[in-house]
């Protein structure tokens, strides 16, 4: 369908209110009683300064509703001309002051007229007065400043006019009042804001269309001009078609546009020589056909035109030629020219010159010829067949059946790809696109399904092969990476041991040289003097020297004498063994308390009793070697605001509002680790039905033959055919001795065995099948298990280091200790330390001012103000949450499982080495390489675990706890729970501060927003569109003359000025005089 853009170009020129080019000239209307003339007057007042004049002139220009271009032209005028225009406008406003200068007056009059249903009782003078009032409103809407129109719209003046139009009786509808009311709407649409308001109103176009029912020719002409102009507005074409459907129901028409064709055909009475109405009707019909979807869609133009042709418009057009009116002929020519072009283009689809749409035979033959030898032909025959079966009785719903069929076919033709109808469809929710989608040919669907199924199978096969190769590649890559990591670690360890070996070798050489030197000196000293008097039994030259070596400890000499002290060792050597205890004394046992001198604390005493902090004091005999020996809480008292602390946690003070909002300390739930369970193999018989069924399910999931499974086990699955989860399931179906014995008895019936039985039989032929399967499963799971264990070990190690080294934690404990000593009395006070579990009891102490405030909230506030470095606590203890999840007992079990599994694989490797090799068996080569790497990796894990346990023991003792009685999840869980409580309390404090600030900010902004809304409202009302009044008149004038459909746009531009200046019928338009500056 060829696009037709003839009308579009005319619109862009005429209806310039929707475009930014070709604006009409500025018209300035002045009223002097009932005559309009250009008033050239000399200003009576002296001209003010230029700055003041520009401000006054700007206010005047704002009321004229001008575009930016014309505003610039106005401001470019000389100062004298500006002052002359300003004085002339102000004088005119002074002369027209009165009640009629306010929109409220006209709205009251409209409501009063609408309330009076009949004009029969009215005197002629009263009727004339009301007509003048409506005419005055029309004039005011055209000539008053912009603020008048804006005020009229804000007061819902349009609804008042529409309500009057809907409720007027017959006499009023035939009077001049009706014509003037339509003129008011037309005048309102000359204004940009008014036009937008009319188009946006839900009922405006429908109510305007209802006025076509009047016999008043001038009213009909005005209505048709408005509707035709609205067709040219973006989105207005469909509104007009909807309005005509509305009028069909309102006027009880048989079909749409029936009244228009009837009026067009009337030629008797007052319609005999009436050309203006016929011109307006043809102008409207051309606008309906050529605008909206008709600009692009040939089918839509044919659809609408056929509706007019079915109403008999063509004979009427032939009769209208008798009027010999140039303007009417112009519209008639456009209608026929457009029809001829469309019918010619439509005929080209069938390779014809013309199609007789009046001939049912020709249209049927063209349709039959087009569909013959196509897949649609059977459906065409079915349509004809069912049309023959359609009921044809004169009574009943026969016409409605054909009407439904007609409307369905119309929708098929004119609906676009999105299922949208450019016309107002009488079939609601009828989307052709969705219907066609459901009626796709079944054969094509079947073919597509078969092709899709075939491609799906091929895709699945290729996907399985790809996944198999990817698994193989990933396994090889992982083994290579693990091997490289292990080799690098072995290299580092070897270099380290080599360096240590050299150092030890050098130390041995140095010690040997010292030993020879001491022997030489001892021999030299023993020869002249003989045995020592204090050592009966002869000299022991080797007893003193032997103490230099670490293995044997130095024995006690007879008589309880002390042995000689060992000589000093060279730098860097190992430490000497401990000396013997003093004579007659014994070393104290390891657990005995060591006396520690503790100075008495000088703790300030509160003036009133305080609420107690329920902590657990650490005994003084357990302070040695802990963090509490490094803490001095007495200096904290110099920083704390003790009066505020006493006031907040007084034991007798009444409750009142405080600075922290209601919050509850949340207790962290204990974290339960999942216990590892050992693989249990069901002891079932081979012939058991359930066991055989489960085995068959497993084999169907594997999608491997018995030979492929056997090859994978012998080669240690070098092609990655057996996933880890499948290996775990295969371990459940290891043939037991009873199964093997039973299968051996029936081995001669191998071909007749069931699938599960044959699988178990063939697997039993593999030497050490179960041990091989377990080794393969351990090999595949080893890296995963090590990867699970290492983060747990690392969490314990890093968590222990963090709590031991954290300065923020140490400072926090110091502050908490000061709080407790100040708040507690008697046995609960005067503490030098407390158990770390007491940290999670801080929140149990409630404030006496507000029960929702806890000691923890207060502590955080003090820390933020006095000890800001403590806020880095969560950063210094970042690994604590992970360490709190580690259960040492379960971790030891996992390490033990790895150790025993590795030992079992080594045992099987030794057994397989002793067996004669079988073809395709790669167990020895693959497992030997695996054992080398796995052993080193496991030893590395064990070293890390030993280091982690040592650091954990050190951390536990650092806080005064007993290492053997507390586990990592319990120890680190205390800190984790405390960190969570601190974060929550800190957030609650922050939320309270934000809420308080928000309330203050909202209060400040409330007044500002109120002032701003008032200012915006004034600006919005004062803001005026960039279009000139009178543009809607230009559009109607162009429609009336037919120039909107003219191909020659230059002619339209040349005639525009002439049309706008032409004085038209005084009953429809008043003269307009332009000011050209």
UniProtKB/Swiss-Prot annotation:
InterPro entries linked to this entry: ARM-like, ARM-type_fold, DAD_dom, FH2_Formin, FH2_Formin_sf, FH3_dom, Formin_Homology, GBD/FH3_dom
GO MF annotation terms: actin binding; identical protein binding; small GTPase binding
Residue positions, PTM Phosphoserine: 34, 1026, 1029
Entry annotated with the keyword Acyltransferase: no
Keyword Cytoplasm in annotation: yes
Main location: cytoplasm
Domain notes: The C-terminal DAD domain may participate in intramolecular interactions with the N-terminus.
Subunit structure: Interacts with CIP4, FNBP1 and FNBP1L. Interacts with the SH3 domains of Abl, BTK, endophilin, spectrin and SRC. Binds specifically to GTP-bound CDC42 and RHOA. Interacts with INTU; INTU mediates the indirect interaction between DAAM1 and NPHP4. Interacts (via coiled coil domain) with KANK1 (via coiled coil domain).
Residue ranges of domain FH2 in the record: 600-1008
Region named Disordered: 457-478, 526-596, 1007-1033, 1056-1077
SMART domains on file: Drf_FH3, Drf_GBD, FH2
Domain DAD residues, every copy: 1026-1057
Record GO biological process: presynaptic actin cytoskeleton organization; Wnt signaling pathway
Knockout-associated phenotype: Conditional knockout mice lacking Daam1 in myocardial cells show cardiomyopathy. Conditional knockout mice lacking Daam1 and Daam2 in myocardial cells show stronger cardiomyopathy.
Sequence similarity: Belongs to the formin homology family.
Coiled-coil segments: 437-526
Compositionally skewed regions (Pro residues) per UniProt: 530-539, 549-592
Name of the protein: Disheveled-associated activator of morphogenesis 1
Annotated segments matching region Actin-binding: 693-702
Protein species of origin: Mus musculus (Mouse)
